Structures are given as structure tokens and as C-alpha cells.
Amino acid sequence: MTFDPFVDRQYSKNTLLKFGGYHMSLAPGKYVYKNRYKKELLGYKKYYNDLTKVIKYFNFLPFDEVLEFETKIAEAIINHYSDKERDIRIPLDEFLSRYQGFDWITYFKALNVKNYSDNLSLEYPKIYQEIFKVIGEKDTMWLKKYLAWRFVNSVAKYASPKLNSIHHSFYWKVLKRQDIFKYIPGYNLLNIDKTFLGVLATREYEKYFINEEIKADFLNVIEYIRNSFIKQLDDLTWLNVSKDKIKHRLEKITFNISNQKYVKSYSKINFDENNYLKNIMTLRRINLDERFSNIGKTLKKDNWFSSSGFRTYASNSFLTSEQYYSAAYLQYPLYNLKMSFYEKVCAIGFIIAHEFAHNFDPNGILYDENNNKNLILSKDEYREYKKLIKSLKKQIDNYRIKDKTPFRGKIQICEVMSDLIAFKVILKALKEDGYTSKEDIENIIDRFAKTFACTQSVDSLLKNSNSCHPLQEVRVNLVLSNIDDFYDIFDVQPQDKMYVASEDRCRIWPN
């Protein structure tokens, strides 16, 4: 667990208020590491020094033994409960980002877990089998081990609160029996970092999912979304004098499929497949030293982003006019080369449109067409803009789950608003292309909802309610509650929970 002001989204309240949000691309160009971070970094430095003692123990421990140890713990936990309580809930997001290439169905069956694929398409394992056809067995052994480890390490995370609680209790009873873990009480030794192997996994992963034909096809979908945004600018009655500046900003955006441009070079590290933890700690030491060296220095525009291509990750940078889409998105159900163009727009198109829409959220408008932190709207436009989004903030604040309202419009407005604008842009574009029947619109709504579908428990979701990305349920329901067509297609009435009066719906973008 490291402190990283760029990557870690769980900022403190003061930091949040200062920088206006959690979204990574909000970091202003003159943002510097503050000295107040130095104390925390020094604390973590001691933590890593302690871990070097642990490394000595693992120097001669093959990764297979570590994995076997973790697997036994996971099996003991799962087998301790009834079939009903074995319903391990896996969100689509987590599945895409962590289990690429791993035969998870076979693994679940081996653990005797029930209901493992209720809401996930069985197409996934077929795709993974195809990956391994083009990668040699020897080359993928470390990847399989890594992915299996990531799964075992997160078995209880998406289970019931009871299972999650007992998991940690049982887990640490086991670990405390081993003196080696006394150096890091209360912390999962194996959950140190995944970036290094993530980079390696990315290289193998992209061999299958990225080729010139797929890139060209994906860029066609991106251009369709971009042109739809530019065309619909003329429909924004609140936008007048700044229209050309925003159009210019949209036109200059470039795209990066996969993150090879931003991956740091770890070429000096000799990867040892039998010394997993040593690899991780070497990488961690490099990253930690780099953070110390950056204290007091200005953030470079080309150093704002870091991720692994095998995770589902998309982003829009206001500082560089760049969008990034990880290779993990380029697979079913979000994308497949054989899909019709309409299907692609209804699937991966929502992800793309969401990133474009960030240019219109409360943080995106703070940057001008030259990527400087300078309000791009006129004073009159900005005044009208704030009026138009006020109702959406209120809806977020009042949204209830299990009789709770744990959401804050001030934090989550950027993501919900980007979802709303993205949906409206796609709906209008497809209507203009002839998809106007009731069945067409119902299908567009259905595809949008499925983009956020998951089987994660509500209690698990509520733990992340302070994130800038609200719960999947919130993102879908709040968007559709502000879509006029939704009321017509599904005959939504005032007594229905999702009903929002017409005059209270957010009209930041025309229907």
C-alpha cells in the first residue's frame, strides 16, 4: 500500500476540495508534490525496509508454493460455508481487469463455488482459450500463476459481509503462525503490487487483442463518436461564444490504444519466475525512490498516467488532449471485430463517449483549448451551465440505497454527468442514423445498462460510495431518469422510484 498522489483516488477531504475532484486528469499543470506528503512517504520507506527482511525468507521459495499456500486458505474459507453463502460475487469490471487469460470457470468448479457465472457471458473462457493458442505454454506459465494468485487473493472481497469478515479473521490466524509475518501485522504480504507483472502481461495480452485491423476499426468508432459530439454542439442553446474553442479542443484529441507510450522502462530488472516477491520489491523500491526525488518538482504533462493494458481502463487528459483505451476493452461483449457498427456504438461506444463527455463536466470546462487551466466558457455561459447541472447534483445527493443516501453530488457529478451526456449523444446520433423504433431505443437503453452490469453485493458496493465513480446502479438509474425516451418506452409514472419530473431533469444536453 503506497501513497501516490497521482494514482490513488482516495484523497483526503482537504485534498479533494483543493483539487476539485478525484479524477486523475484533474491534476493542474503546476501541481507539485507537497512537503506534507514527505512524512507519509518516510513512513512507507520504513515499511519497505521492514519488508526486505521478509524477502530473505522468500528468496528460495518457488512461486508455486506461495500460490499453493494461498489456495489452501481460499479453499478452507469457501468450504466452511453453506452453498448459499458461497455465492462469490464478481463485478464485470473486476473480472475484465484481473482474470484475463485464466480459466476461471474451471477454477471456480474446483473450489465448488456456486453461481459463478449467472450474469457473465460464457464467451469469455472461449476468448481466453484463443489467447493461449497464440502464446507458448512456457511463456504463459508465469502469467497463469499471477492471475491465479490475483484471484485467490481477492476471493472474499466480493462475498457477503459475514464471509468477508470471517475471511480476514481466519486468514490472519493462519498467517500469525508463521514468524516471518510479524514484520507486517495486519497486512496481506502477497498483496503488494501488480504493476510489474501487469506490464509483462500487457505485452502478451496485446499480441492477441491489438492488430492493425482492430486498431483501424476501433478508431472508426472513435471518430463517429467525436463527430457526433462536434455536430451536436450546435444544439446546445446555452453555448454560444465558446463553441468554436470547444470544437477545436475536441478536434485536437489524439488516441492511444494500449498504454505502451506511458509504461515505464523496467528493462534493467531481471525477471525471475521463481522469485516473484523479489521482482515486486525491486520494482517498489524504484517507484518509491522516484517519488522521493519528485518532492517539490512540477508535474510533467507526460507523467500523469500509469496503468496496465490488461486492465479495463479508459481516460481523458485535459493536460495533453489525449485519450487512452486499454487493450482489455477490445473484446466481447464491449467489442468484437465481427459486431455490426451499430452494436459497437451501443457497446464500446458508451465508453468512448463517456471520455469525450468529460470535456464538458465541471472539471473539463476549467481547461481551455490550449490545455491551460483557464475556464473555456464565458461568464454568461458558465452561469447558465451551473444552473443546468444543479438538478443532477441534487439527484445524486438524494439517491437512496438500503434507506441510505451515501452519495455526494459535489464529488460524483463529473462521472454521472459524463455518463448522461454520453448516453444522450449516442442516442441522438443513432436516431439520426435511422434507429428510431421503440425496439431500437429499448435496445440502446438495454445495452447501456449492461455496460455497468455486475454481481457485486450491495454492501460491497457501498464501501466505495465515496469514490468519484458512484455505484453501477446509481450510474444507470440516474442517467435513465433524465432521459425522456426512457419514460415513453417503459411507461414510467410519478409513483415509480426512478421518476423525475420533466422540469427537474438535467438538460445540459438536448434529448
Stretches with model-predicted labels:
Residues 63, 72, 76, 87-105, ...:
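Intrinsically disordered, low-complexity linker/terminal regions across diverse proteins
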Residues 1-230, 260, 282, 287:
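Noncatalytic, helix-rich "gating/capping" subdomain that lines the substrate-entry/channel surface
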